[in-house]
């Protein structure tokens, strides 16, 4: 791969995929689709809900930018949930950061259906 940044991003996506799969989650890597992108990964959780996963392995963390990108990809994919997974420098994959909207968090930990 000629682009070092792309190689780092792809490596992080694969590490996240393998980590999530090790927990028995049904997770797939999505092919790059440019302006029609539907996230880096998609998974189906134990309740059968689909999640769009956007993975970032950058020096500077841009939460707003990453969440905006995730929201567009989530809507495009028609998935009810989304998560931004950010590489934590100098740490194991399991120590990466996961960012989700408060509404998605409440929906996943509550028995209430809104």
Regions found by a protein language model. Give the residues of each.
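Catalytic phosphate/metal-binding cores of nucleic-acid and nucleotide-processing enzymes, i.e., regions
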Residues: 1-114
């Amino acid at each position: 791969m000629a682009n070092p940044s792309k190689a780092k991003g792809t490596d992080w996506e694969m590490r996240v995929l393998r980590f999530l799969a090790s927990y028995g989650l049904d997770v797939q890597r999505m092919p790059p689709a440019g302006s029609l992108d539907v996230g880096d990964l998609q998974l189906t959780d134990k309740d059968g809900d689909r999640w769009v996963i956007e993975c970032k392995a950058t020096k500077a963390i841009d939460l707003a930018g990453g969440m905006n990108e995730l929201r567009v990809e989530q809507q495009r994919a028609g998935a009810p949930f989304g998560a931004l997974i950010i590489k934590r420098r100098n740490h194991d994959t399991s120590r990466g950061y996961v960012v989700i909207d408060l509404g998605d968090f409440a929906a996943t930990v509550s028995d209430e259906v809104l």
